[in-house]
Amino acid sequence: MNTYEGNLVANNIKIGIVVARFNEFITSKLLSGALDNLKRENVNEKDIEVAWVPGAFEIPLIASKMAKSKKYDAIICLGAVIRGNTSHYDYVCSEVSKGIAQISLNSEIPVMFGVLTTDTIEQAIERAGTKAGNKGSECAQGAIEMVNLIRTLDA
């Protein structure tokens, strides 16, 4: 039986990051977590490109453009959608998650889902670097691991 796993060796990995500006007080912390992790794992700063979009709904379009460019080994998508008093939250969360998944499947590169979908601002804050860790950092680590797993499977 063969078992395959990725590792956290960041040799020659190029990363695209798409960040939503809406709820920037949260998303900027997710971005900081992702960048800190990538630097800690020795991803070269020149191999990281960040694109800011107005909100979470716009993330899939830019992630798709990045994937089609073939410049990146992985794409990290960061946003924060916080439930309000209308059904808008449900539509945005559903479409963003479907869009990101579809891009990954179509492009066959890792597109990491770092879009927080929370009921409260407090829950978002917890996931952006306090009690529940930093989902941006987790996505960066997952991106490196997935790139290496794909490289292993393609070898």
UniProtKB/Swiss-Prot annotation:
Q: Which reaction does it catalyse?
A: (2S)-2-hydroxy-3-oxobutyl phosphate + 5-amino-6-(D-ribitylamino)uracil = 6,7-dimethyl-8-(1-D-ribityl)lumazine + phosphate + 2 H2O + H(+)
State the Pfam families in the record.
DMRL_synthase
Spell out the molecular function terms from Gene Ontology.
Answer: 6,7-dimethyl-8-ribityllumazine synthase activity
Ligand binding ((2S)-2-hydroxy-3-oxobutyl phosphate)? 85-86, 127
GO annotation terms (biological process): riboflavin biosynthetic process
Which Gene3D superfamilies has this protein been placed in? Lumazine/riboflavin synthase (3.40.50.960)
Q: Could you tell me the keywords of this UniProt record?
A: Riboflavin biosynthesis, Transferase
Domain of life from the UniProt record:
Bacteria
Q: In which pathway does it act?
A: Cofactor biosynthesis; riboflavin biosynthesis; riboflavin from 2-hydroxy-3-oxobutyl phosphate and 5-amino-6-(D-ribitylamino)uracil: step 1/2
Q: Which residues are responsible for catalysis?
A: 88 (proton donor)
**GO CC term (a single one):** cytosol
Q: What is its EC number?
A: 2.5.1.78
**InterPro entries found in the cross-reference section:** LS (IPR034964), LS/RS (IPR002180), LS/RS_sf (IPR036467)
- Residues where 5-amino-6-(D-ribitylamino)uracil binds: 22, 56-58, 80-82, 113
Member of which family? Belongs to the DMRL synthase family.
HAMAP family the UniProt entry points to: Lumazine_synth
Q: State what this protein does.
A: Catalyzes the formation of 6,7-dimethyl-8-ribityllumazine by condensation of 5-amino-6-(D-ribitylamino)uracil with 3,4-dihydroxy-2-butanone 4-phosphate. This is the penultimate step in the biosynthesis of riboflavin.
- The protein here is known as 6,7-dimethyl-8-ribityllumazine synthase
- Per the UniProt record, the source organism is Streptococcus pneumoniae (strain ATCC BAA-255 / R6)
Q: What is the lineage of its organism?
A: Bacteria, Bacillati, Bacillota, Bacilli, Lactobacillales
